C-alpha cells in the first residue's frame, strides 16, 4: 500500500521511501522517514496535491511522489525511549550572570576590536526576518509563506557596532536540495561566522530541531532562539528550557520576535558565545545501543577515515562524516578521497545498511528524528490544538474546499481590482490630482509674475509638473494594490493559492510554487524574479522568470489609467480586468510553447509547508506600503524626472539647438521617426508614441509623463480608441523596465536578458497587431 491510497483522516506508518537523489533526501529531511506516522489531512480541489501531517506539521505532496512512499496501517513504534544524558556544564544562567552560561575555565576571549559576525539560520517561515528586524532595526519585508527571504541581508545589532548579522534564506536542512539551501550552507562553511543564531519555531519544534542538529555538527558557537513561545504558552504548552540546554549543550533562549520579548537576553548570549568562542558541547546524536549500534559505529569509523581530509577541506569532521555517509556530492568533492578511501567509505556504509536494514540516508535521518523525539519527551509539554490551527482549518474549508477554492480565488482577485481601480484607489487618486493641479497653477502664476524665461517656464510647467505630476497622481492606486497583496501574503493565503493551483500550473509545465513569484509579479517584476530562487528546479526557475513579465506590474497602472480615463471612461474596471486577463492568457500560451521547446520535461515535485493563517501585522503592512511609496517617489523624482527633462529638451530644440515652435521639427521627432514605420501597422505611427514607449524602458511610469509633455493634453484628438486599445496591448506585454531586465541578467545572464527584451517586444507587437486587426473588422 502506498501513501497515495491513504484516505482523508486516516493514519499510517511509513515503511519505505522511494525515489532517488536530492528529492528523496529532501523527503527524509522533512521527516518522511521509515517509522514516521503520517496522516492525510485533505486533497486539493482538483484531487492533487495532498496535504499531510507528519511530526506535528502540515506539508503538501503530489500523488506521483506519494505513490513512491510505502506505508502500513499498524500502530506506530513505541514512544518509550532511553533518556538522553544531560550535559552538566550547560546549565541556564542565573539572574545577573550576563549571558555566561557555563564554566569559564577554558575562556579565551577574542580581541576587543574583533568583528563579531553571525549567521541567522532557521526554517522557512519561522520568524527569521522578524527577528533580524528586531536585532538590527531594519525594515526587511516579512511574509507568511515559505521563501520570503531569497537573498542574504546583512545588518548590525543595535547598540553593538562591532557586530554583523546575516539573515540567510530559510532552509529545512543542510542538504543541497534548493539554491537557497546551498547559499545558506556555503555561507556557514565558507564565510566562517563567529557564531550562529538558530531560530526555532517553538510551535513546530520537532521539524525545526532537525536543522538544529545539523548546525551543532558544524562545531560553531551557537545559541538557539525558541521563537513564538507566546503562542506555546497561550495554548497551554510549555518547554523546559533549562533541560533543553542541558541536552543540546548550547544556550536556549525563549523569545517572541513579533512582540520583541526575550530579544535582549538573546543578544547577551549571542555576544558572549561569539566573544569567548564557546562551541556546542554535544555533536554526537547516535545511540550506541540503537539497532545494535550500527549507525554509531558507521559514523565514528567514517570520521576516523576522513578526518585528515576534513581538516584540509576546512569542514567540521562530524558534519563531513554524516554528509559523506548520505552521499552529499558537494562535500565528497571537497574531501577529495582517493580510490581506496572511497571504496573503504562505501564498504563501511554498506555494512551499516545491511545491519540497519534501511538505506544510508534514511538511517541518518532516523537517527536525528529519534534523538529529537527523546529530547521532546524530556522537555516539551505539547500544547493542545492551537487557536491558530483551529482557525486555519475553518478558513481552509472555504478557501481550499473542493468546490469553493477556485471561485473564492477569482472572487478575491476581482474584489481586489474593483476596490483598487473603482473605489479606494480611484477616490484617493482624484484627491491627489486636484492637489497637483492646484500646485501647478500656483507655480505657473509665480513664474509668470517673476517674468521667468519662456524656455525655463516651459520646462517647469510643461515638462516637470505635467510629466512628473501626472505620474505622481497614480501613487494611490499603486499603494492600494500593494496593500491588498500584502494582506494576502501576510495572512498565509498565497501559500494556499499555490496548493490549489498546482495541478493547473502543472498542465503548462510548472509547479504550484511558481504561483508565488507570479503573484508578486503583479506588484513588481524585480522581487518576483528574485523570488524564483525558492524554486528547486533550474528548469522551473528559468521558465518562471521568463513568464513573470507577462504578469502586469503596478508600474504599468499609470499607462492603463491614463488611456482608460481618456478613451474608455465608462468601462474602466472592465478594461483593466481585461488587460490583466490578457497578460495571463498570453503567458499561458507562451508557457505551452516553452514547455514544448526550450524547457521540455516534467515540473519538479510540489513539496511545501502550509503555514497557519495569521492576522497581518499593522506594522508590517504599513512598512511595506511605505517602502513601495518611497520607491515610487524616488523613481518619480529621479529616473522619471530625468526622462521627462530629456524628453522636453529633445522635443523643444532642433539639431542646431534652436527652440522650435513645432515639435515635429525637433531632435526627438527626427530620432523617433526612424521607428515610426515599425509601429504603423499597429495604428501607432506617430513619432511621439514611439518616444513614449522608448522612455518606458527606463521606467514604465515615464510613458505617461512623456505623452503628457509631447501631446500637451491633446492626445484624444490624435489617437483613435482603436489605436489606444492597440497601444494598451503593446504596453501590457513589451519589455520590462531596465531594473527588471537587470534582475533577469543577474539571475540568468546577459543572453537571457537580451532574449527577454527582444521576445517581449515581439510578442507585444503581434498581440497589438491582432487587437488592431480585430478592432478594425468590428
PLM segments and residue spans:
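Canonical P-loop GTPase G-domain recognition
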Residues: 232-285
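Hydrophobic core segments of alpha-helical transmembrane domains in multi-pass membrane transport
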Residues: 408-419, 481-486, 564-566, 579-593, ...
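Transmembrane helix-loop junctions at the membrane interface of multipass transporters and ion channels
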Residues: 550, 554-577, 739-749, 770-778
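Extended helical scaffolds that flank P-loop GTPase cores
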Residues: 249, 276, 283-453, 659-668
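Conserved C-terminal guanine-recognition region of P-loop GTPase G domains, centered on the G4
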Residues: 160, 185-252, 559
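Extended, low-charge hydrophobic alpha-helical regions
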Residues: 355, 362-366, 382, 423-464, ...
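Conserved G1/Walker A P-loop phosphate-binding module
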Residues: 92-173
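Juxtamembrane inter-helical linkers in multi-pass membrane proteins
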Residues: 434, 438-442, 495-525, 600-624, ...
Amino acid at each position: 500500500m502506498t501513501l497515495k491510497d491513504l484516505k482523508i483522516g486516516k493514519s499510517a506508518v511509513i515503511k519505505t521511501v522511494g525515489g532517488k537523489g536530492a528529492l528523496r533526501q529532501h523527503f527524509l529531511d522533512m521527516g518522511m522517514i521509515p517509522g514516521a506516522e503520517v496522516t492525510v489531512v485533505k486533497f486539493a480541489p482538483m484531487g492533487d496535491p495532498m496535504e499531510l501531517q507528519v511530526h506535528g506539521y502540515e506539508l503538501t505532496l503530489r500523488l506521483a511522489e506519494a505513490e513512491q512512499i510505502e506505508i502500513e496501517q499498524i500502530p506506530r513504534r513505541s514512544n518509550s525511549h532511553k533518556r538522553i544524558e544531560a550535559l552538566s556544564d550547560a546549565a541556564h544562567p542565573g539572574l545577573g550572570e550576563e549571558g555566561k552560561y557555563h564554566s569559564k575555565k577554558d575562556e579565551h576571549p577574542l580581541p576587543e576590536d574583533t568583528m563579531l559576525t553571525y549567521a541567522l539560520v532557521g526554517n522557512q517561515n519561522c520568524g527569521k526576518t522578524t527577528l533580524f528586524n528586531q536585532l538590527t532595526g531594519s525594515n526587511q519585508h516579512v511574509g507568511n509563506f515559505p521563501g520570503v527571504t531569497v537573498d542574504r541581508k546583512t545588518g548590525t545589532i543595535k547598540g553593538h557596532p562591532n557586530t554583523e548579522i546575516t539573515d540567510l534564506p530559510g532552509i529545512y536542512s543542510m542538504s543541497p536540495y534548493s539554491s537557497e539551501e546551498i547559499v545558506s550552507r556555503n555561507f556557514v562553511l565558507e564565510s566562517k561566522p563567529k557564531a550562529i543564531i538558530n531560530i526555532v519555531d517553538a510551535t513546530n519544534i520537532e521539524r525545526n530541531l532537525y536543522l538544529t542538529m545539523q548546525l551543532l555538527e558544524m562545531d560553531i558557537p551557537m545559541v538557539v532562539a525558541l521563537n513564538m513561545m507566546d503562542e506555546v504558552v497561550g495554548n497551554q504548552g510549555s518547554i523546559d528550557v533549562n533541560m533543553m540546554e542541558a541536552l543540546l549543550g548550547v544556550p536556549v533562549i525563549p523569545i517572541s520576535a513579533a512582540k520583541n520579548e526575550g530579544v535582549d537576553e538573546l543578544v547577551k548570549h549571542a555576544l558572549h558565545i561569539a566573544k569567548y568562542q564557546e562551541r556546542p558541547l554535544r555533536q554526537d546524536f547516535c545511540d550506541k545501543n540503537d539497532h545494535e549500534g550500527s549507525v554509531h559505529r558507521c559514523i565514528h569509523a567514517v570520521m576516523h577515515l576522513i578526518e585528515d581530509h576534513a581538516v584540509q577541506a576546512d569542514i567540521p569532521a562530524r558534519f563531513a562524516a554524516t554528509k559523506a555517509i548520505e552521499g552529499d556530492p558537494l562535500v565528497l568533492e571537497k574531501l577529495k578521497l582517493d580510490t581506496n578511501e572511497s571504496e573503504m567509505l562505501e564498504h563501511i556504509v554498506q555494512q551499516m545498511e545491511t545491519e540497519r536494514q534501511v538505506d544510508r540516508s534514511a538511517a541518518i535521518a532516523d537517527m536525528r528524528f529519534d534523538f529529537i523525539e527523546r529530547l521532546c519527551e524530556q522537555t516539551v509539554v505539547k500544547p493542545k490544538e492551537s487557536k491558530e490551527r483551529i482557525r486555519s482549518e475553518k478558513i481552509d474549508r472555504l478557501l481550499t474546499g473542493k468546490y469553493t477554492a477556485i471561485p473564492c480565488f477569482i472572487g478575491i482577485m476581482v474584489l481586489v481590482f474593483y476596490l483598487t481601480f473603482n473605489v479606494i484607489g480611484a477616490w484617493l487618486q482624484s484627491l491627489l490630482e486636484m492637489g497637483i493641479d492646484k500646485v501647478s497653477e500656483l507655480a505657473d502664476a509665480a513664474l509668470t509674475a517673476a517674468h521667468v524665461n519662456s524656455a525655463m517656464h516651459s520646462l517647469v510647467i510643461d515638462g516637470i509638473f505635467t510629466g512628473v505630476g501626472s505620474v505622481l497622481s497614480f501613487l494611490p492606486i499603486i499603494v492600494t494594490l500593494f496593500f491588498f497583496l500584502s494582506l494576502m501574503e501576510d495572512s498565509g493565503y498565497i501559500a494556499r493559492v499555490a496548493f490549489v493551483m498546482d495541478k493547473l500550473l502543472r498542465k503548462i509545465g510548472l509547479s504550484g510554487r511558481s504561483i508565488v513569484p507570479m503573484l508578486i509579479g503583479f506588484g513588481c517584476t524585480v522581487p518576483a524574479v528574485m523570488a524564483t530562487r525558492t524554486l528547486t528546479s533550474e528548469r522551473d526557475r528559468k521558465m518562471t522568470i521568463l513568464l513573470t513579465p507577462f504578469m502586469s506590474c503596478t508600474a504599468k497602472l499609470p499607462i492603463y489609467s491614463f488611456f482608460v480615463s481618456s478613451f474608455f471612461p465608462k468601462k474602466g474596471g472592465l478594461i483593466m480586468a481585461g488587460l490583466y486577463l490578457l497578460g495571463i492568457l498570453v503567458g499561458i500560451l507562451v508557457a505551452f510553447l516553452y514547455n514544448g521547446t526550450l524547457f521540455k520535461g516534467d515540473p519538479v515535485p510540489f513539496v511545501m509547508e502550509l503555514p497557519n493563517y495569521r492576522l497581518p501585522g499593522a506594522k508590517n503592512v504599513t512598512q511595506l506600503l511605505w517602502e513601495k511609496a518611497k520607491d515610487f517617489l524616488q523613481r518619480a523624482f529621479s529616473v522619471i524626472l530625468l526622462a521627462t527633462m530629456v524628453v522636453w529638451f529633445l522635443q523643444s530644440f532642433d539639431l542646431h539647438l534652436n527652440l522650435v515652435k513645432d515639435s515635429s521639427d525637433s531632435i526627438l521627432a527626427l530620432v523617433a521617426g526612424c521607428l515610426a514605420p515599425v509601429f504603423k501597422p499597429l495604428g501607432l505611427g506617430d513619432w511621439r508614441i514611439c518616444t513614449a514607449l522608448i522612455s518606458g524602458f527606463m521606467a514604465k511610469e515615464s510613458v505617461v509623463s512623456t505623452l503628457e509633455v509631447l501631446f500637451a493634453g491633446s492626445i484624444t484628438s490624435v489617437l483613435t480608441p482603436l489605436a489606444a486599445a492597440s497601444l494598451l496591448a503593446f504596453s501590457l506585454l513589451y519589455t520590462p523596465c531596465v531594473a527588471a531586465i537587470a534582475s533577469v541578467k543577474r539571475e540568468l545572464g546577459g543572453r537571457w536578458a537580451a532574449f527577454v527584451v527582444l521576445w517581449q517586444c515581439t510578442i507585444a507587437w503581434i498581440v497589438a497587431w491582432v487587437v488592431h486587426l480585430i478592432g478594425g473588422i468590428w
